[in-house]
Amino acid sequence: MSNGIVIIGSGFAARQLVKNIRKQDATIPLTLIAADSMDEYNKPDLSHVISQGQRADDLTRQTAGEFAEQFNLRLFPHTWVTDIDAEARVVKSQNNQWQYGKLVLATGASAFVPPVPGRELMLTLNSQQEYRACETQLRDARRVLIVGGGLIGSELAMDFCRAGKAVTLIDNAASILASLMPPEVSSRLQHRLTEMGVHLLLKSQLQGLEKTDSGILATLDRQRSIEVDAVIAATGLRPETALARRAGLTINRGVCVDSYLQTSNDDIYALGDCAEINGQVLPFLQPIQLSAMVLAKNLLGNNTPLKLPAMLVKIKTPELPLHLAGETQRQDLRWQINTERQGMVARGVDDADQLRAFVVSEDRMKEAFGLLKTLPM
């Protein structure tokens, strides 16, 4: 292939793609360009760094140099790509440019920070780099406010609480995990967080932040306020699409791709958190792994469509872990909930009594794979 494959990004998606390409072709030129150090780390570990007493550098599994040597790559770390000339098939940075035969965007997603006064005081934990920038403040903080009660917010709330910190979690919704499941299903974890000492401020809104002599004053609705030492935004991710937009690619929530992971330009593909696959943004490990396997084949000329099975999503809250699958967010499902001391099985069924979703917890997570087989594709 003329000029080989250029990949923008160095996270989980990019690395999975490299490994799958190299299983099939040991010599095709591969170039990776990324704004970070390109060291490998396990991103889900960020939800547990405080209770584990880990520093940012402790998360590194493989250095960029070791990665390059193992997989025969050209790496350009700490490099910001400024533009893509799709017609000329050239990627540009301020001081360099790279010709490509095929280009892959694996630019990930950035943490959304609510646009309130004082938003610059909010921290995010979406990368090793972001944790490195704030690890001292988080380790020293006694009082922590987490903004957002979704998957990451719930994981962080439990982790900081396990580390002995006073944790407050605020969310507009009436229950935690509101975008993933109904309150009658999430209530078991919500109760456990409360038992542990997490102060839940649900149906509440953060209105602003202000630095004080003794911490950060968070102003809430209904004339309430709370003083803390650190504020973490856990209000979701936004796919990184700016580069693709400047290149003239079709954008919706993410970079739009088809079942072959191909964008609106025949020579440009997208993978991972930045990609919107046939209308779906899937920022979870399993779909990224499966997508990387398919994309490697497609880049090497073995055109294969992506077919995603029903997949598990894991909520890593060690005191009460959950697995879920299917259309758990559907409003029209009837939930059949079986709760025992050792865990919960919640089944979401439609009007025809067909299983469409499930959530399992604790010791009953072992039932997940059996339930997974009964979900429709």
Swiss-Prot record:
GO cellular component: cytoplasm
EC number in record: 1.18.1.-
Transmembrane intervals: none
Catalysed reactions listed for this entry: 2 reduced [nitric oxide reductase rubredoxin domain] + NAD(+) + H(+) = 2 oxidized [nitric oxide reductase rubredoxin domain] + NADH
Keywords: Cytoplasm, FAD, Flavoprotein, NAD, Oxidoreductase
Taxonomic superkingdom: Bacteria
Disulphide connectivity of cysteines: none
Entry GO MF terms: oxidoreductase activity, acting on iron-sulfur proteins as donors, NAD or NADP as acceptor
Pathway membership, UniProt: Nitrogen metabolism; nitric oxide reduction
Presence of keyword Flavoprotein: yes
Subcellular compartments: Cytoplasm
Annotated InterPro entries: FAD-bd_OxRdtase, FAD/NAD-bd_sf, FAD/NAD-binding_dom, NO_rdtase_NorW, Rbx-bd
Cofactor(s) listed: FAD
Function: One of at least two accessory proteins for anaerobic nitric oxide (NO) reductase. Reduces the rubredoxin moiety of NO reductase.
Family: Belongs to the FAD-dependent oxidoreductase family.
Protein name: Nitric oxide reductase FlRd-NAD(+) reductase
Organism field: Escherichia coli O139:H28 (strain E24377A / ETEC)
Taxonomic path: Bacteria, Pseudomonadati, Pseudomonadota, Gammaproteobacteria, Enterobacterales
Gene: norW
